[in-house]
């Protein structure tokens, strides 16, 4: 069995594609996997590091406004179609799976026109433009959120699978998670993160929250600021006279122990990227979600609203975020254990812990061999 996976531009497209590739290999060790991405994108580094064969093609995201650059990008897309055609002829795949991003367009389209079985996976509640266009050409579209189904034209092609998350998510005890982080398992724990790059608006609001929590030994804080804003955040805390090095606080540049942190957390504060939300849903954690305002087509707000609608999260728009209104929400939830419990139950009900198996089964059912 020979499979091509493709997706790129951001980690939100790359990591699901890698998870699918590894999931297929776990069930079919004899499978041959080829990842097609752009030569300049993150995938050119991440895919070989993951031990998956990589082939690069031309590609670049379309500018939001028509310009000379638009013509240049269009030229690269036509070149990518030709390059993809050559790769398909040589590799002869039994299946092509796309996870979105501009590189997936020419790869999935060319494969579909060749009659090769093709699949898409959509991570967000609001589908990306590439996946919406490709829907008419592929065999099936696997989706993460039920809310995205209405945005696709061909309903019979849609399969609700969820988004793959790390195997550790939801499978570590609260006690083990707290122990690994040097925290207590019998205290309320607030987990705050803006992702690996951080979120300046969240980092600017958090000092107010810490001021209110300074005398609270019963509430622990895990706060990952992101590498880009770590020093700036520490300087801000110092300027405000906040002693952040406390026994029950962890102010970190990057949180490498996310499964452990989620295991011992009672409340999550952060952005609303699809992978983040898939993880908090599988872990069954209530969220205060602050969608990234510059996400393509505002898809993070659509993601966040999907959880809010089902009672699993509260949403604050980035433009409305202040230290005091963040604290008001945090306090209002941490001091209402029954509400937290109901939100956690709602989040867990939305989770798809078996997402990868569902996706792999669709892949195996669709492939030629």
UniProtKB/Swiss-Prot annotation:
It is an enzyme of class 2 (transferase). Pathway: Cell wall biogenesis; peptidoglycan biosynthesis. The keyword Cell cycle applies. GO terms for cellular component: plasma membrane. Pfam families: Glyco_tran_28_C, Glyco_transf_28. GO terms for molecular function: UDP-N-acetyl-D-glucosamine:N-acetylmuramoyl-L-alanyl-D-glutamyl-meso-2,6-diaminopimelyl-D-alanyl-D-alanine-diphosphoundecaprenol 4-beta-N-acetylglucosaminlytransferase activity; undecaprenyldiphospho-muramoylpentapeptide beta-N-acetylglucosaminyltransferase activity. It comes from the Bacteria. It catalyses: di-trans,octa-cis-undecaprenyl diphospho-N-acetyl-alpha-D-muramoyl-L-alanyl-D-glutamyl-meso-2,6-diaminopimeloyl-D-alanyl-D-alanine + UDP-N-acetyl-alpha-D-glucosamine = di-trans,octa-cis-undecaprenyl diphospho-[N-acetyl-alpha-D-glucosaminyl-(1->4)]-N-acetyl-alpha-D-muramoyl-L-alanyl-D-glutamyl-meso-2,6-diaminopimeloyl-D-alanyl-D-alanine + UDP + H(+). UDP-N-acetyl-alpha-D-glucosamine binds at residues 10-12, 124, 166, 196, 300. Its EC number is 2.4.1.227. Keywords: Cell cycle, Cell division, Cell membrane, Cell shape, Cell wall biogenesis/degradation, Glycosyltransferase, Membrane, Peptidoglycan synthesis, Transferase. One of its GO terms (biological process) is regulation of cell shape. The keyword Cell wall biogenesis/degradation applies. Belongs to the glycosyltransferase 28 family. MurG subfamily. PANTHER family: GLYCOSYLTRANSFERASE, UDP-N-ACETYLGLUCOSAMINE--N-ACETYLMURAMYL-(PENTAPEPTIDE) PYROPHOSPHORYL-UNDECAPRENOL N-ACETYLGLUCOSAMINE TRANSFERASE 1. This is UDP-N-acetylglucosamine--N-acetylmuramyl-(pentapeptide) pyrophosphoryl-undecaprenol N-acetylglucosamine transferase. It comes from Desulfitobacterium hafniense (strain Y51).
């Amino acid at each position: 069995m020979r499979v091509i996976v493709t997706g790129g531009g951001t980690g939100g497209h790359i990591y699901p594609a890698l998870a699918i590739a590894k999931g297929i290999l776990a069930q079919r060790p004899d499978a041959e996997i080829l990842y097609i991405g752009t030569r300049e994108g993150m995938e050119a580094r991440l895919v070989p590091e993951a031990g998956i064969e990589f082939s690069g093609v031309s590609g670049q995201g379309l500018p939001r406004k028509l310009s000379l650059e638009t013509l240049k990008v269009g030229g690269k897309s036509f070149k990518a179609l030709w390059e993809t055609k050559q790769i398909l002829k040589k590799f002869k795949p039994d299946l092509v799976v796309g996870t979105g991003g501009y590189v997936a367009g020419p790869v999935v389209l060319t494969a579909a026109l060749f009659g090769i079985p093709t699949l898409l996976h959509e991570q967000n509640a609001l589908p990306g433009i590439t996946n919406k266009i490709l829907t008419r050409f592929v065999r099936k579209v696997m989706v993460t959120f039920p809310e995205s189904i209405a945005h696709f034209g061909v309903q019979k092609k849609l399969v609700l699978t969820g988004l793959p998350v790390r195997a550790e998510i939801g499978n570590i005890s609260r006690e083990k998670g707290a122990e690994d982080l040097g925290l207590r398992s019998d205290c309320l724990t607030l987990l705050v993160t803006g992702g690996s790059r951080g979120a300046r608006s969240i980092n600017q609001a958090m000092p107010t929250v810490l001021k209110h929590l300074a005398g609270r030994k019963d509430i622990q804080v895990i706060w990952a600021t992101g590498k880009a804003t770590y020093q700036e955040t520490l300087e801000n805390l110092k300027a405000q006279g906040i002693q952040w090095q406390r026994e029950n606080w962890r102010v970190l540049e990057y949180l490498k122990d996310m499964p452990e942190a989620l295991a011992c957390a009672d409340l999550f504060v952060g952005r609303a990227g699809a992978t983040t939300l898939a993880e908090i849903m599988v872990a069954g954690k209530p969220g205060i979600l602050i969608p990234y305002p510059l996400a393509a087509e505002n898809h993070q707000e659509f993601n966040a609203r999907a959880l809010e609608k089902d009672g699993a999260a509260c949403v604050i728009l980035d433009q409305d975020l202040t230290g005091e209104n963040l604290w008001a929400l945090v306090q209002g939830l941490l001091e209402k254990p029954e509400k937290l419990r109901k939100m956690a139950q709602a989040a867990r009900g939305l989770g798809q812990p078996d997402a990868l198996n569902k996706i792999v089964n669709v892949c195996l059912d669709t492939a030629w061999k």
